[in-house]
């Protein structure tokens, strides 16, 4: 939805939600985002990662958290902590999560202070019946139950001012700022203007709050009006001053739909509530004196349609207590899953209010375009609206909608272009399309794509259907809608176009429609730069375009002897997601294919035609970095049977950054000698090319040599699965081998299968060589052998101390298999053999291993073997804090290994930190250094008083990293520590569960 272009003449598209996030970031010291499945923090995360400071020149702490029961405990704990720094606390969440946050968030009132305003920015959004819908009822119910004041934005352009006003009001009491979800996905050009950060801060600093939250909310709104020359009010009236009937609305959808009725109904007005709870005086001040009746629109839950809403009941009580008999007040309830539109509102109220039908007015809209396409790859919309980008007198807004449940992912976009010298800040609803664009003829089989087409509009359909077959093969509903509305149908066959897999003929046709009189070559020139076309490409495109286009003449005979579909088709896509479908179910099985060097040569010579992309690891979704080995040192003696080593990587100019507690994902490489041996034994060509469909870059293919694929991608030396044996059976041509394979995958062969896997430890390579008559090509091997999985290792350094390197602590996993062969863990062995200066691919993985917010809180660390790695990073960070003059609480370290002589990992570091009084206590458990075994839990049990002081008396945090086996015993010790703090028996397990919720009990075991 956001696109940029290096050209000075090309505008930038931005999501409307940016203006909300900008206010939040400018005013907040701490931001808690509970929006993992909804894009409410896109810009917040970008700005925070870039080191942007807020408007007060302070660093911003951004916490992206899971939305689950008890999730608000982290915010509550941070807010109520004695050492919590002053400043605005902001939360981002969809309204559907409020019920999960409610139990704990309601406890914040007793601790509330003006120095720490709390404002909750809520996208009124719920997911019901497999679609997203506007959800204001959750916000209003939450507000009423917890005494939170609510500010409602009624358009995208208002959102910045209302976000600011709600933050001002939060100086007196916690506040919710609610906005409807169009802001999340509506993209505009030019960008909605961001408020000046200095002005925002000045406005905030100059505001003096009142004690009463309701009157304070009105005052905050007036303060914003005075500062920015706006005219927002707690309740706003639209319509005639002589209206006798008024519709009361809350939120954007209700207000927009109700206001659309006014043109045809002068006796009707609209009263939009902006602040809840409300004051009767604010309502009566704006209502016409002629008003005799109010109809309150009330959104309710589907299970409560028969019951008045809390919102309506509160409004009724407020108004009647002031003027008991002045008005007739009624309620129109509608459920969460019902969308409020002009037509639905007219149907519901036309008898009650004696309404006349109203025609939606496309205010400031010159062209409305509906685009239906697969959600694979980039959207066509940016290319389509490029025709307007150089026209400074017009603006563009578009709103994509993703239906992940149809055709493995459909993107439906409404794009609108403004009239001259007008600015669109949102997509205007209920406007029929002047142009409908379909990228495949499969879409009309699932939707009535022309249901929202305007009379005598145009439909561009990309399809390889023969023109004379179009009326027979296209669905009944599509033809019927086209005939009813007089839609002109143009078929565009991409196969007849000069450039393969190109949407250019469709785009050129569109450009000519919106720029009448423009020639084909001129239309192509508009798109040439955007599509990297050369002069040769342009000439070929012009010559072939006429062959690609067919104008279809439709008449009533096209429906003769045809019947409508048994299933009623929807007229729009269901919004089931805010992003393309990440999991594709393809109708045809696209598999790896053998390729040749001639094809690759064409891709290199003509990159613009093939849309060639170069990527470090195109097969993975994570951001990948290239680092180089700086040091690789074995920590255990050479004669010792365990190789544990410390390895350092030089970050160079890779741009890799990491936090303490995070892990480094390493993309291991198979042993090249073993790969060469397998290629030779199996009879493959190392230089043959394999063409693989890209998962991460849909619509693209990845090309590698066989040698590259077997080294970097295919887990050829991994443990073969039963599914692999079943797939291998399909290629088997020898009867005996086929029979052996069938027995092996049957229940009777289970013991033998287990022996081969766990004793003989056969690999995919072993099995392929064993069943030599099931001869596979390299492409077929790539199809049935899984990819090498990334291995992750806890980072043992802090970037505060080592700004240009990252360190790992790794043990080489080694054993002998049933055939006496030396075997090793693929990635640990790869790392151990790396030489200084060698490159490798890595990615950073976030972790739960985070230090307490307060540096004064004690921490207790328990690590076994290589599980000590993150605690070295912790101490390096604490060392850096001390250098900044930041004091630390007590730090206790418990470590477990086999022997002190061979496995005192990072021992010199621990001793140095202990001598420097940074590390308070070292508890050492070397299990094999004495006749009897001593384990880490034994050492912890011997220092229970120390643990009680750190964890119970001072509220410290406990961390465990290492193998899973000691977890029950260590937990038992902690339960004893908890019980020792009470005179009567307590449920220690429940307290540990509470610690987990508060992130004071963190484990990372493997």
Swiss-Prot record:
Enzyme class, spelled out: oxidoreductase
One GO CC term on file: cytosol
Chemical reaction(s) catalysed: hydrogen sulfide + 3 NADP(+) + 3 H2O = sulfite + 3 NADPH + 4 H(+)
Pfam families linked: FAD_binding_1 (PF00667), NAD_binding_1 (PF00175)
EC identifiers of the protein: 1.8.1.2
Names of the cofactor(s): FAD; FMN
Keyword line: Electron transport, FAD, Flavoprotein, FMN, NADP, Oxidoreductase, Transport
Family matches, as InterPro entries: CysJ-like_FAD-binding, FAD-bd_FR_type, Flavoprot_Pyr_Nucl_cyt_Rdtase, FNR_nucleotide-bd, NADPH_Cyt_P450_Rdtase_alpha, OxRdtase_FAD/NAD-bd, Pyrv_flavodox_OxRed_cen, Riboflavin_synthase-like_b-brl
Pathway in which this enzyme or protein is active: Sulfur metabolism; hydrogen sulfide biosynthesis; hydrogen sulfide from sulfite (NADPH route): step 1/1
Residue ranges of domain FAD-binding FR-type in the record: 622-852
Its biological purpose: This enzyme catalyzes the 6-electron reduction of sulfite to sulfide. This is one of several activities required for the biosynthesis of L-cysteine from sulfate.
Protein name, per record: Probable sulfite reductase [NADPH] flavoprotein component
Originating organism: Schizosaccharomyces pombe (strain 972 / ATCC 24843) (Fission yeast)
Lineage of producing organism: Eukaryota, Fungi, Dikarya, Ascomycota, Taphrinomycotina
